[in-house]
């Protein structure tokens, strides 16, 4: 230990300290209140990164007393851990970090410490405050981007009547700039969350959903696990149980469409020629014939079922399989203005094993949630061309004053704390519905993979510290929960600021969020109404202010700044649609 005392490098291992019970008062950006804890003298200078170290009572019966939370010089402080604290932490378990695999989906590769000089990571300015864990560069071939966007033959005719073309495909020259900007935006250091306010936000939404689960016990009957076959094929004729998209990629490192790894269907054998229709006939007892999807991976090309079993076994032990999300450039028509700025959107595709495992555990739950949009505050599954739209309007105008908004780069810059909180809500619903513990463990690990993702960018592998991949199978559902938690965070943060930190929702100083706000989300879009008689602090301007404090940018539906507290109901815009009552 003595040899380390004068070094600047972080200490590893353990060291003895003496301590006494005290009230620890911290002055921090989070505004943490004084709490019961311990103070002690360190045999070395405290350093950034020491927070989280365990304080253990040594002896014949050793026990964990607390966690190091603050230090100044050789003075340290820690919070005490009790049974209640440990119980709370078990709501979502972060999986254990493991070594990077050398083979994925039958493809072997090496990871080198040296990263090519042209890679975007070398072009991050020194003054940019970014944080990421650079894993290295793999030795597999990388793809090149080319756009398939072409000019319509109608453009010339349209110009004769005054309609001028204002869109085109992305420029290839913008590829490096797009990857560079995306790398910086994802990994830029953002302000910390206040864990107390986040807990209030999560408790609020769980209270609402818990009351619903108690009042609607039949909901649990519709939440169940799916078999491997049903996760691939869905259930024909049942809303929400669609088959897996066979035209999308298998993910890294295969990077080829799923259809390339499928067996030909029974229909193909019957016709005697290949077909894109992966279906099979079912001869029923009454003599009728029905059809079902018949998506089967060819084990000779890729044994996906075995790959999935290996993933599930590892995930059940809370060990990370280190799934890799490949960053791809989106080939879409862009306005000339965006082309001039060198903009190309980047999305991250998920590996097929993650997609299947997630569908097996969550698809039935997600489908059941779509039947209760106002309970789960999500418009996923809502028919915008039918009666659902009228019911939605009635709900979101429940109170007198309305708000609406959007986020800038929502999931890519999602704080890991909110992401983990959203997964804890989903896990709560799964657990309450009777999903076995082994599969809840798998869900924990999948949540860890998504909340703390590993990205592949043009050969570079790195782990992000505050981002959610845009191509994972729970994207729209999880984004909606992220949205709902963010709104609650802004709500409680506004009161926490106004009440000069004396506010505690358990004392009933103000109503719970869902009692005074009627919120509806779809991904990063939201629209709501507020009971201003009971809730004067929560509005568009306060939302933007409070979320800005944690690095989120809350904008108007048109992506501009909010200039007023509320929006008239007649001017509400949601999912690029307005609400106009039928004249009849």
What are these regions (language model features)?
Residues 1, 72-75:
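Catalytic-histidine neighborhood of serine endopeptidases
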Residues 1-18:
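Short glycine/Trp-rich loop-beta-loop segment that forms part of the substrate-binding cleft
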Residues 6, 60, 70-72, 409:
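Conserved beta-strand elements of beta-rich interaction domains across eukaryotes
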Residues 24-29, 52, 70-72:
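Terminal interaction modules at protein C-ends
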Residues 25, 89-584:
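Viral RNA-dependent RNA polymerase
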Residues 34-41:
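Short Pro/Gly-enriched beta-strand edge/turn motifs at strand-loop
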Residues 43-69:
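Catalytic nucleophile loop of clan PA
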Residues 74-83:
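A short, polar/charged loop-to-alpha-helix boundary motif
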């Amino acid at each position: 230990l003595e040899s380390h005392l004068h070094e600047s490098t972080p200490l590893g291992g353990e060291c003895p300290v003496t301590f006494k019970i005290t009230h620890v008062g911290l002055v921090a950006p989070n505004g943490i209140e004084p709490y019961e804890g311990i103070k002690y003298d360190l045999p070395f200078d405290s350093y950034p990164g020491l927070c989280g170290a365990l304080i253990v009572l040594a002896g014949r019966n050793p026990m964990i007393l607390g966690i190091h939370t603050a230090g100044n010089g050789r003075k340290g402080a820690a919070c005490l851990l009790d049974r209640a604290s440990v119980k709370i932490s078990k709501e979502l378990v972060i999986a254990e970090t493991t070594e990077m695999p050398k083979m994925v989906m039958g493809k072997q590769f090496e990871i080198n410490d040296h990263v090519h000089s042209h890679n975007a990571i070398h072009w991050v300015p020194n003054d940019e405050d970014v944080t990421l864990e650079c894993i290295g560069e793999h030795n597999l071939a990388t793809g090149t981007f080319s756009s398939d966007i072409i000019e319509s033959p109608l453009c010339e005719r349209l110009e004769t009547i005054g309609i001028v073309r204002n869109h085109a495909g992305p420029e290839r020259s913008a590829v490096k700039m797009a990857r560079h900007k995306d790398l910086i935006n994802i990994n830029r250091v953002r302000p910390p969350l206040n864990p107390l306010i986040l807990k209030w936000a999560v408790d609020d939404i769980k209270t609402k959903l818990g009351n619903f689960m108690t009042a609607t016990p039949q909901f649990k009957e519709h939440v169940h696990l799916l078999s491997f076959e049903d996760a691939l094929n869905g259930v024909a004729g049942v809303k929400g149980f669609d088959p897996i998209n066979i035209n999308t990629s298998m993910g890294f490192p295969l990077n080829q469409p799923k259809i390339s790894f499928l067996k030909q269907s029974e229909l193909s054998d019957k016709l005697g020629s290949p077909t894109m229709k992966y279906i099979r006939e079912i001869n029923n007892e009454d003599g009728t014939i029905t059809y079902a999807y018949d998506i089967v991976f060819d084990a000779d090309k890729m044994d996906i079922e075995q790959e999935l079993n290996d993933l599930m076994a590892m995930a059940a032990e809370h060990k990370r399989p280190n799934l890799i999300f490949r960053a791809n450039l989106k080939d879409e028509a862009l306005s000339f203005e965006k082309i001039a700025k060198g903009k190309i959107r980047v999305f991250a595709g998920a590996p097929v094993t993650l997609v299947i495992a997630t569908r097996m555990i969550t698809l039935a739950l997600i489908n059941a949630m779509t039947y209760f949009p106002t309970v789960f505050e999500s418009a996923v599954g809502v028919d915008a061309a039918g009666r659902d739209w009228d019911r939605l309007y009635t709900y979101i105008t429940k109170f007198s004053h309305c708000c609406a908004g959007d986020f800038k780069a929502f999931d890519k810059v999602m704080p890991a704390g909110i992401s983990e909180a959203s997964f804890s809500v989903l896990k709560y619903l799964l657990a309450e519905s009777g999903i076995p513990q082994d599969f809840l463990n798998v869900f924990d690990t999948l949540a860890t993979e998504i909340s703390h993702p590993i990205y592949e960018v043009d050969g570079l592998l790195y782990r992000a510290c505050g981002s959610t991949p845009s191509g994972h199978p729970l994207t729209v559902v999880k984004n909606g929960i992220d949205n709902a938690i963010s709104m609650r965070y802004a709500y409680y943060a506004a009161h926490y600021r106004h009440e000069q930190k004396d506010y505690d929702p358990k004392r009933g100083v103000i109503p719970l969020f869902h009692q005074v706000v009627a919120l509806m989300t779809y991904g990063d879009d939201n629209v709501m109404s507020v009971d201003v008689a009971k809730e004067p602090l929560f509005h568009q301007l306060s939302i933007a202010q409070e979320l800005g404090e944690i690095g989120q940018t809350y904008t108007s539906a048109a992506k501009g700044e909010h200039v007023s507290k509320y929006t008239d109901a007649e001017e509400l815009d949601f999912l690029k649609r307005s609400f106009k009552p039928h004249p009849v």
